[in-house]
UniProtKB/Swiss-Prot annotation:
Condenses 4-methyl-5-(beta-hydroxyethyl)thiazole monophosphate (THZ-P) and 2-methyl-4-amino-5-hydroxymethyl pyrimidine pyrophosphate (HMP-PP) to form thiamine monophosphate (TMP). It comes from Clostridium botulinum (strain Hall / ATCC 3502 / NCTC 13319 / Type A). The keyword Magnesium applies. This is Thiamine-phosphate synthase. Pathway: Cofactor biosynthesis; thiamine diphosphate biosynthesis; thiamine phosphate from 4-amino-2-methyl-5-diphosphomethylpyrimidine and 4-methyl-5-(2-phosphoethyl)-thiazole: step 1/1. It comes from the Bacteria. NCBIfam families: thiE.
Length: 205
């Protein structure tokens, strides 16, 4: 499956400001988002399922891949395109056994060792970060910056997206590393005009 990782949106309902998640995701896709990850923390399984199913209606309509953060059961229940796993989540090999070879599995990495391990274990793509300080994620172990991103990117051959504090003022510097895409939350969701915010993060508008 050929995936376009150019503009990777991660959902966070804290930024909705009373707006409907489905509408926000649709506007983001219309603005240029190429892949969507549904990320829900501290909610019940049923609520996560309902949110993911709602988002999938939009991504299916626009033929955009939908990735579920962490929860393989939710990914299976809605027949998502794949999952994204952190370093402390289920081991990639087990996730692959459960989901099968046709699903996308992405792994969060913060250094060359983690990146090579994930690649060798069969990850489809990597989420590399944290690049810049960010307010969206509190448990940031280390800010790696552009230099750290470049080192990791140069060590691997699979697709990767950069994450962490990326916005319209710095995304071009990130893309100069040759990375396949950028992953954002607040740079799109915290803006009033979602479609424009997404479009402002595209290098070839």
């Amino acid at each position: 499956m050929e995936i376009n990782y150019e503009l990777y949106l991660i959902t966070d309902r804290r930024f909705l400001k009373g707006r409907q998640l489905k509408k926000v995701v649709e506007d983001a896709i219309l603005g240029g988002v190429t892949i969507v990850q549904v990320r829900e923390k501290d909610v019940s399984t049923r609520e996560f399922y309902n949110v993911a199913k709602e988002v999938k209606e939009v991504t299916d309509y626009y033929k955009v891949p939908i990735i579920i953060n962490d929860r393989l059961d939710i990914a299976q229940a809605i027949d998502a395109s794949g999952v994204h796993l952190g370093q402390k989540d289920m081991h990639l090999n087990i996730a692959r056994e459960i989901l099968g070879k046709d699903k996308i599995i992405g792994i969060s990495v913060g250094n060359v060792k983690e990146a090579l391990q994930a690649q060798n274990n069969g990850a489809d793509y990597l989420g590399i970060g944290t690049i810049f300080p960010t307010g969206s994620k509190k448990d940031v172990d280390a800010i790696i910056g552009i230099d750290g991103l470049s080192k990791i990117k140069d060590s691997i051959s699979i697709p990767s997206v950069a994450i962490g504090g990326i916005n319209k003022t710095n995304f071009k510097d990130v893309l100069k590393t040759g990375i396949e895409g950028i992953s954002v939350i607040s740079a799109i969701l915290d803006e009033d005009d979602i479609k424009l915010a997404a479009n402002n993060l595209l290098i070839n508008k």
